[in-house]
Each structure stands twice: as C-alpha cells, then as structure tokens.
C-alpha cells in the first residue's frame, strides 16, 4: 500500500510537471506569434529645419533662374547718371543702379532731386541702387548745394578735430539722414586709404595714417550707416597709400606685401567685420599682387578679397572711364575684362557701349553664366539688406507696348 501511494505521488508529480511544460510552451508560441503580428517600429525622419538665410538663398536662386540673360547682365552695371534719357536707360538696360554726381544736384531743390530719383525708381523693374560720393571735405556732391544743406560736410579729419568721435558718429548720422531723405541708398564711403604724404593724392580724403584711428573711423561710419540702412562702400582696395591719381593715368605701387598686411589691409578687414556689403577696387597696379594688371582688372587681387579676406559681398570697380583703365584696355573692352576677373558691379559712364560687349562675352562663353548668376545674387542680397528689394512682395512690372506720342507727329 505504501508502494502504491508512492507510485501515485510520482505519477501525479510527473503529470503536473508535464502540464507546466505544455503551458509554458504554448505561452511562448503565443508570445512569438503576437510579436510577429505586431508591425515593426518605424523610424520617424524629422524634417530638416532650414535657416532663414538658406530659405532666402533658395528664393533668390529661383528668382535669378527666371531672369533673362539680358536682365542679369544689366544688374551688373552701376551707371553714372546721364544728362539725357536717364529714365529710358533704366528700362532699356535693366541697370543695377545710378551713381549721381554734382551736376545731378546743382541748383536743384530737394523736391526736384526727390522727383528725379523717384522717376528712375518708378521705371526700374528691380529697384535701383542710387549712389553718391558724399565723403565730406573735397568730395561733397550733395551738400555742396545750399538748397540741400546749409553748409557742406567737413572732411573726416576736420570733423574729428572739431568734436572727436562723437562728432564723427553724428556726421555719419546726418549724412545718412540727408541722403536717405532724397532717395539715395548708397554712399560711396568711407575712404579706407591711409596716407602720410600731405602732398599725396588721397591725403585730404584720408582720415588718418594711424591704423587704430583709421579702423575706429571705418567702424563708426559703417556701423552707423548700417543702422540707418544706408549702404557703404569701402574704398579703394587694396589701398592707395601715397600713390598718384589714377583719374589721369596708371599708378604703380612697389610696396612689399607685408606692408599691406600690416597697414592698408586692416581698415578693409575692419569694414567687413562691421558689416560693409561692398568694396570698391582701385585702378593702381600693385606689383606685389599683380604686376601686369590694375587691381580692378586683376584676378589675383580679387582672389585676395574672396580667399584671404573671406569677403562674399559685392566687389565693384572704380569708374571704368578713368584714364588708368582706358589707356590700358580701351573703352569697350574694360567692362568685359573687369567682369571676367570677378567684379560684380561695373561702374561706368558709357553703358550703351559697355553693356553689349559684356552681354556678348557671356553669350559666347568668355564670361560664364554661373559667374553672372553669382554676381547678381550678391547684388540682390545687398538690395535686400538695404530694404530696397523685397523678394516676397516683388511683382514684375508689365511694360506698356502702346506706342508713345512723338512730339511734332502728325495727328
């Protein structure tokens, strides 16, 4: 009887163990099937957040791709405003802007100047840069007219001598307010050249021969102007020093590169750091950089700005009609050579002859279309920064095809 009970206990225990194994196996299979029936976890790809600058770049790229080649080439011209047909020239060449000189202000009232500039802007499809040289002292295109300012602006040197840095800042503010009130959005200043020769070409226009003083002057002018949304132009890269006037012929500079690094370059670095959007390149030949071409026509000089200075703003020429350039290339070829070496804006007085030459050079591949696109993008960005051009509200103007009445025509 004890043996039977013992066997029964063993058998019951075995059955219990077998049942437990069966249940555990079934649960494992169900769990496995359940896992197989569940969809695999999906990795959610978060959309890449683009910066405002990247978004704007894409908008500009699209805008430029929709422009005609003729429109793009026109944007590269910063033209001396002609005596006649100034309004017609705006739409005929789709120019990037006008530079005004003393003759555009002489004897005019403020309202007359404002009306003139408004007529140019009203004709432009893409709003214009309207520039002027209002340095103070010997270069005062606007304030030399007593209808526009009671007295001309003093030179930077005299301004500082009269009132120190507060006076320099106030002077920059007053210039910005006056120019903007007329419709001018770019002042071709400050002068970054440093000269110690009182008989030198740039002496009266230069602020100081001391690097620290010149740097502070450039910073004050650029930052003050930028706060008002007045464009500035750092000039004349790479620095005239004590050289002669290139309006009357080519000037040669034999200084060592180290001298430029230690002196002349520094105000331009300061201007870039302070937010300047444009640099004007001079016509002097600087042998340590390029002994063959004037700086404005030198690929090597432009490479210094792009690669060493890391400057990605607008590079513009000095006036291509100056003797230093016309003696070197001839009038028609100057703009083509200037564009090929990397200038974005071509400052000229004869757009009617220069524009067709540049357009043809792009059409035949002498100047790449990609380079033109890059230049136009820099120009449009500058216009955006000045509040002149708004890509989000831009609407292309529809030009009238109706024939205009001709004075003296028969009815």
Label the model's feature ranges:
Residues 88-214, 236, 241-254, 282-297, ...:
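Enzymes and membrane/adaptor proteins characterized by extended Gly/Ser/Thr/Asp/Glu-rich
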Residues 3-15:
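Bacterial N-terminal signal peptides that target proteins for export
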Residues 23-26:
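C-terminal motif of bacterial Sec signal peptides marking the signal peptidase cleavage site
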Residues 28-29, 35-130, 134-144, 410-411:
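N-terminal hydrophobic targeting/anchoring segments and the immediately downstream early-domain regions
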Residues 74-75, 96, 125-130, 184-185, ...:
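Short, well-ordered coil/turn segments that N-cap beta-strands
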Residues 217-236, 259, 263-276:
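Phosphate/pyrophosphate-binding betaalpha-module
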Residues 278-281, 285-290, 304-411:
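Active-site or pore-adjacent capping/gating segments
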